[in-house]
């Protein structure tokens, strides 16, 4: 039976971007059953004591620059340290992932495109026109009307799932993006992917909260 992983993330998160390809490689190698769960980070932070970047102490903001550069080089990914459209409102983009899944599409190509849009291409994923362009490149050529996905992303069903994802994240002890949850054990941050891989390959029981 495939190992199940709940993957909590937001498309505005540089850490989710830096870890996404590595996580998907881990999933493919190990035959993981991944459930994509986009979340509105502000909702999770508000409930779990996290702070948006602008409200963090300068020392924490400064340390972030070191880590971004370290992991950019470690992952060998293009990364604009001060992207033109960061921060921006990620909600419509996040809900586009939900709309794709609901319509039966694999969201991975869109997720990768959206991450690249923010972190290497200086494009605004809060702009519906940018999202429409990305969707058209993926879906229209395959004969599926991309406008249908964007309309669904802006609709009440996607909003309800998005809100439920945040509620489930909080209940699961998720505190940021990305988080990978294996059988109740939370791995917070793309820098924990080696530990997740160890847990999966060893087949060990999940560690518990004492």
Task: Please place each PLM-identified region on the residue numbering.
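C-terminal cap of thioredoxin/glutaredoxin-like
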Residues: 3-6, 12-32, 102-105, 109, ...
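Structural alpha/beta surface segment adjacent to cysteine/selenocysteine redox centers
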Residues: 11, 17-118, 207
